[in-house]
Amino acid sequence: MFLPSPNNLSGLNQNILEELLRDKRSPNTRRTYAKALKDFFLTMAGEEPSPDVIAWFLSLDHFQAIAMVLRYRAELLAKDLKPATINVRLAAIKSLVNYARRVGKCQYTLEDVEGLKAETYRDTTGVSPTSFKQITDHITPDSLKGKRDLAIMRLLWDNALRRAEVCGLNVGDYQPTERQLLIKGKGKLGKQAITLSAKGMALINQWLTAIGPRPKNEPLFCTLDRATFGHRLSGNAIYNLVRTSAESAGIHKVMSPHRVRHSAITAALEATNGDTRKVQKLSRHSNLNTLMIYDDNRHQHQAQITDILADLL
C-alpha cells in the first residue's frame, strides 16, 4: 500500500519523529523506536519516515489510522514474528501518535489497537556459581584490561547489574567510603545507591589504581585501545567481554551480560531458599511476579511433574 502525496502540511514545521525520540530517556528505546517506525512506514507507505509522510499519517481520520495499523499488525503476524517484537513495534507507533496529540499535530488515538499476549522472562537459565568462577578465573589480573574486566564481571555477578547500568557509571559514582555505587536503573530518572561487596570494591580499587587519577565525570570503565583510549565502554563491548570470556573458559552456553544477571538472581534465590522479597532488593525488579518465574524455573516444577506422569505408565 502506497500513500498519496501529502497535502496541507504548512502547519508542520518540525520533524515529529525526531522530537519523539529526543523525548525518550533511554538510548536503547530511541534506537528501538526508530527502527520500528522505519519498518512501519516502509511497509505501509513504501518509504522511510519523513516529516511529510509522518504528517500524512497523522492527518488520517480515526478509523483510517486504526485500519492501517491493524493491517500492519497482520503483516507482522504473517511474518511469524514473536509477540514481544510485534508489541514493541505497535508501542512505537502508539507513542508517535500520543506525542503528536500532545503537541496538537494529531486528532486520533490508537487505544483500540491491542497488543498480543506475550510470555515474558521465560528463559531465565544461566550458569552455576562454579561455572561463573571458571569464567573469571580465566581472566588474568596482570594487565590493565584484565583488571578492568574482572571488576566489570564482579559487578555483573555480585550486584546483578544490567550492561546499560555498567556503561553509564562514572568515576564519581563509586563511593568507597560508603561502600556504595550510584547506578541509573532501568526506567529510572535519577540514580540509586547500591551496596558493593568487599571483593567487588577490591577489584574496582585495583582497576582505578592501575588506570590512574581521572575526573569524576569520566566513565568508570573505559576503552583501552590506542584509537579510543578513555572513551565510555559501549553495551556491545560489555556483551563481547562476557561472551568471549565464557568461550575462553570452555563454557558451552552462549553467555551475555543479561545471562550473567539471570545466573546471579537464580543463585541468590538458591542461597536464600527462595526468599523473593530479599532477592528483589538485588534484582530491583518492580514486579515480584518476575522473580516468581525465576523461582519456578529454579525448581523445575514442570519437569518434575512430567517425570511423575511418565513413571505412572
Curated annotation (Swiss-Prot):
Residues 7-101 form the Core-binding (CB) domain. One of its GO terms (molecular function) is site-specific recombinase activity. One of its GO terms (biological process) is cell division. The keyword Electron transport does not apply. CDD domains: INT_C_like_5. InterPro entries: CB, DNA_brk_join_enz, Integrase-like_cat_sf, Integrase_catalytic, Integrase_recombinase_N, Integrase_SAM-like_N, Tyrosine_recombinase_XerCD. The active site is at R162, K188, H258, R261, H285, Y294 (o-(3'-phospho-dna)-tyrosine intermediate). This is Tyrosine recombinase slr0733. Site-specific tyrosine recombinase, which acts by catalyzing the cutting and rejoining of the recombining DNA molecules. Residues 122-307 form the Tyr recombinase domain. Belongs to the 'phage' integrase family. It is found in: Cytoplasm. Keywords: Cell cycle, Cell division, Chromosome partition, Cytoplasm, DNA integration, DNA recombination, DNA-binding. One of its GO terms (cellular component) is cytoplasm. Gene3D superfamilies: 1.10.150.130, Intergrase catalytic core.
